Protein backbone atom coordinates (compact mmCIF):
# COMPACT_ATOMS: atom_id res chain seq x y z
CA UNK A 1 0.00 0.00 0.00
CA UNK A 2 1.17 3.53 -0.75
CA UNK A 3 1.22 5.56 2.45
CA UNK A 4 1.71 9.31 2.27
CA UNK A 5 2.78 11.39 5.25
CA UNK A 6 2.50 15.16 5.63
CA UNK A 7 4.52 17.28 8.05
CA UNK A 8 5.81 20.83 8.41
CA UNK A 9 9.51 21.47 8.95
CA UNK A 10 9.72 23.59 12.12
CA UNK A 11 11.25 27.05 12.38
CA UNK A 12 12.68 26.45 15.86
CA UNK A 13 16.41 26.89 16.18
CA UNK A 14 16.87 23.96 18.57
CA UNK A 15 14.94 20.72 18.42
CA UNK A 16 15.18 18.20 21.23
CA UNK A 17 14.32 14.53 20.69
CA UNK A 18 11.17 13.48 22.56
CA UNK A 19 9.55 10.17 23.42
CA UNK A 20 6.03 10.75 22.08
CA UNK A 21 3.71 8.34 23.92
CA UNK A 22 0.66 6.88 22.16
CA UNK A 23 -2.01 4.51 23.38
CA UNK A 24 -2.07 0.90 22.13
CA UNK A 25 1.20 1.02 20.17
CA UNK A 26 4.78 -0.10 20.64
CA UNK A 27 7.02 1.96 22.96
CA UNK A 28 8.21 5.19 21.31
CA UNK A 29 11.68 5.96 20.02
CA UNK A 30 13.13 9.43 20.65
CA UNK A 31 12.52 11.76 17.71
CA UNK A 32 12.45 15.47 16.95
CA UNK A 33 9.57 14.96 14.54
CA UNK A 34 6.25 13.43 15.67
CA UNK A 35 5.58 12.26 12.09
CA UNK A 36 8.56 9.89 12.42
CA UNK A 37 6.85 8.17 15.37
CA UNK A 38 3.65 7.98 13.31
CA UNK A 39 5.63 6.27 10.55
CA UNK A 40 7.12 3.79 13.00
CA UNK A 41 3.62 2.97 14.24
CA UNK A 42 1.86 2.69 10.87
CA UNK A 43 4.32 1.38 8.28
CA UNK A 44 4.06 -2.30 7.45
CA UNK A 45 6.31 -4.59 5.37
CA UNK A 46 5.69 -4.02 1.66
CA UNK A 47 4.37 -0.47 2.05
CA UNK A 48 5.55 2.23 -0.32
CA UNK A 49 6.27 5.55 1.37
CA UNK A 50 6.31 9.18 0.44
CA UNK A 51 6.58 12.23 2.72
CA UNK A 52 5.37 15.72 1.87
CA UNK A 53 7.43 18.24 3.85
CA UNK A 54 6.06 21.79 4.01
CA UNK A 55 8.88 24.27 4.61
CA UNK A 56 9.91 27.88 4.36
CA UNK A 57 13.29 28.63 2.83
CA UNK A 58 15.55 29.81 5.66
CA UNK A 59 18.56 28.64 7.68
CA UNK A 60 16.56 27.11 10.54
CA UNK A 61 14.32 25.03 8.31
CA UNK A 62 17.32 23.96 6.19
CA UNK A 63 19.03 22.60 9.31
CA UNK A 64 15.84 20.97 10.60
CA UNK A 65 15.10 19.49 7.17
CA UNK A 66 18.52 17.81 7.14
CA UNK A 67 17.81 16.42 10.59
CA UNK A 68 14.48 15.08 9.36
CA UNK A 69 16.24 13.36 6.45
CA UNK A 70 18.69 11.77 8.90
CA UNK A 71 15.86 10.39 11.04
CA UNK A 72 14.05 9.12 7.96
CA UNK A 73 17.23 7.38 6.77
CA UNK A 74 17.21 5.40 10.03
CA UNK A 75 13.80 4.07 8.94
CA UNK A 76 15.16 3.19 5.50
CA UNK A 77 13.41 6.13 3.82
CA UNK A 78 15.56 7.85 1.21
CA UNK A 79 15.64 11.54 0.30
CA UNK A 80 14.01 10.88 -3.08
CA UNK A 81 10.91 9.70 -1.19
CA UNK A 82 10.55 13.16 0.34
CA UNK A 83 8.92 15.98 -1.59
CA UNK A 84 9.27 19.55 -0.38
CA UNK A 85 6.23 21.81 -0.56
CA UNK A 86 7.41 25.42 -0.53
CA UNK A 87 5.75 27.80 1.92
CA UNK A 88 6.18 31.54 1.33
CA UNK A 89 6.64 33.56 4.51
CA UNK A 90 3.52 35.70 4.11
CA UNK A 91 0.15 34.52 5.39
CA UNK A 92 -2.09 36.17 2.80
CA UNK A 93 -5.19 34.15 1.87
CA UNK A 94 -4.01 33.66 -1.71
CA UNK A 95 -0.72 32.24 -0.42
CA UNK A 96 -2.48 29.77 1.86
CA UNK A 97 -4.94 28.78 -0.88
CA UNK A 98 -1.94 28.17 -3.14
CA UNK A 99 -0.32 25.97 -0.47
CA UNK A 100 -3.58 24.04 -0.10
CA UNK A 101 -3.72 23.49 -3.86
CA UNK A 102 -0.08 22.37 -3.94
CA UNK A 103 -0.76 19.82 -1.20
CA UNK A 104 -3.82 18.46 -3.00
CA UNK A 105 -1.88 18.20 -6.27
CA UNK A 106 1.01 16.42 -4.52
CA UNK A 107 -1.21 13.76 -2.96
CA UNK A 108 -1.46 10.55 -5.02
CA UNK A 109 -4.84 9.50 -6.35
CA UNK A 110 -4.69 6.21 -4.44
CA UNK A 111 -3.11 6.35 -0.98
CA UNK A 112 -3.64 6.38 2.77
CA UNK A 113 -2.59 9.72 4.29
CA UNK A 114 -1.24 10.50 7.74
CA UNK A 115 -0.74 14.17 8.60
CA UNK A 116 1.09 15.85 11.49
CA UNK A 117 -0.04 19.35 12.47
CA UNK A 118 2.43 19.87 15.33
CA UNK A 119 4.75 22.37 13.66
CA UNK A 120 4.24 25.47 11.56
CA UNK A 121 2.24 28.67 11.83
CA UNK A 122 -1.28 28.64 13.23
CA UNK A 123 -2.69 28.56 9.70
CA UNK A 124 -0.97 25.29 8.76
CA UNK A 125 -3.46 22.91 10.47
CA UNK A 126 -6.36 24.66 8.71
CA UNK A 127 -4.61 24.44 5.35
CA UNK A 128 -3.69 20.78 5.89
CA UNK A 129 -7.19 19.73 6.95
CA UNK A 130 -8.74 21.65 4.05
CA UNK A 131 -6.36 19.93 1.63
CA UNK A 132 -7.29 16.52 3.04
CA UNK A 133 -11.01 17.28 2.71
CA UNK A 134 -10.54 18.40 -0.88
CA UNK A 135 -8.37 15.40 -1.78
CA UNK A 136 -10.83 12.93 -0.26
CA UNK A 137 -13.53 14.43 -2.47
CA UNK A 138 -11.51 14.63 -5.69
CA UNK A 139 -9.05 11.74 -5.63
CA UNK A 140 -9.79 8.22 -6.85
CA UNK A 141 -9.18 6.34 -3.62
CA UNK A 142 -7.63 8.50 -0.92
CA UNK A 143 -8.20 7.64 2.73
CA UNK A 144 -7.15 9.69 5.75
CA UNK A 145 -5.47 7.32 8.21
CA UNK A 146 -4.78 9.87 10.94
CA UNK A 147 -4.19 13.50 11.84
CA UNK A 148 -1.64 13.87 14.64
CA UNK A 149 -0.56 16.50 17.11
CA UNK A 150 2.51 16.15 19.34
CA UNK A 151 2.11 17.82 22.73
CA UNK A 152 5.05 18.49 25.04
CA UNK A 153 4.27 19.51 28.64
CA UNK A 154 6.93 21.52 30.45
CA UNK A 155 7.33 22.96 33.91
CA UNK A 156 10.10 25.44 34.77
CA UNK A 157 11.78 24.64 31.47
CA UNK A 158 11.84 20.87 32.15
CA UNK A 159 9.96 18.38 29.97
CA UNK A 160 7.30 16.54 31.97
CA UNK A 161 5.81 14.45 29.18
CA UNK A 162 5.33 14.16 25.44
CA UNK A 163 2.22 12.64 23.87
CA UNK A 164 1.04 12.05 20.35
CA UNK A 165 -2.68 12.58 19.85
CA UNK A 166 -4.67 11.41 16.84
CA UNK A 167 -7.11 14.18 15.96
CA UNK A 168 -8.80 12.19 13.18
CA UNK A 169 -12.09 12.11 15.09
CA UNK A 170 -12.38 15.90 14.81
CA UNK A 171 -11.51 15.71 11.12
CA UNK A 172 -14.26 13.10 10.66
CA UNK A 173 -16.68 15.30 12.60
CA UNK A 174 -16.30 18.09 10.07
CA UNK A 175 -17.22 15.61 7.34
CA UNK A 176 -20.24 14.36 9.27
CA UNK A 177 -21.46 17.89 9.93
CA UNK A 178 -21.38 18.47 6.19
CA UNK A 179 -23.86 15.59 5.73
CA UNK A 180 -26.34 16.69 8.40
CA UNK A 181 -29.93 17.17 7.33
CA UNK A 182 -33.14 17.91 9.21
CA UNK A 183 -33.57 14.22 10.01
CA UNK A 184 -30.23 14.05 11.85
CA UNK A 185 -29.66 15.67 15.20
CA UNK A 186 -26.30 16.74 16.56
CA UNK A 187 -26.60 13.91 19.11
CA UNK A 188 -26.93 11.35 16.29
CA UNK A 189 -23.88 12.78 14.55
CA UNK A 190 -21.79 12.60 17.73
CA UNK A 191 -22.92 9.02 18.39
CA UNK A 192 -21.85 8.08 14.88
CA UNK A 193 -18.52 9.85 15.39
CA UNK A 194 -17.86 7.96 18.64
CA UNK A 195 -18.68 4.66 16.94
CA UNK A 196 -16.38 5.47 14.01
CA UNK A 197 -13.56 6.41 16.37
CA UNK A 198 -13.92 3.15 18.31
CA UNK A 199 -13.94 1.02 15.14
CA UNK A 200 -11.31 2.75 12.99
CA UNK A 201 -8.23 0.99 11.62
CA UNK A 202 -4.78 2.48 12.34
PLM features per residue range, with description:
Residues 1-112, 133-202:
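Long, low-complexity, Lys/Arg-enriched
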Residues 115:
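Detector for conserved single-position "signature" residues within domains
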Residues 122-136:
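Short Gly/Thr/Asp-enriched flexible loops that form oxyanion-binding sites at enzyme active sites
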Amino acid sequence: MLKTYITTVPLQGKLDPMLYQRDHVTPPVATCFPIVQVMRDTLEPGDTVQLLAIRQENADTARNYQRLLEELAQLGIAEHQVRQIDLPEDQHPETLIGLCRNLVDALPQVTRVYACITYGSKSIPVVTLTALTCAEATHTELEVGGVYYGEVKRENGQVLSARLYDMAALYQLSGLVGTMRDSRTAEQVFHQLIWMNEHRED
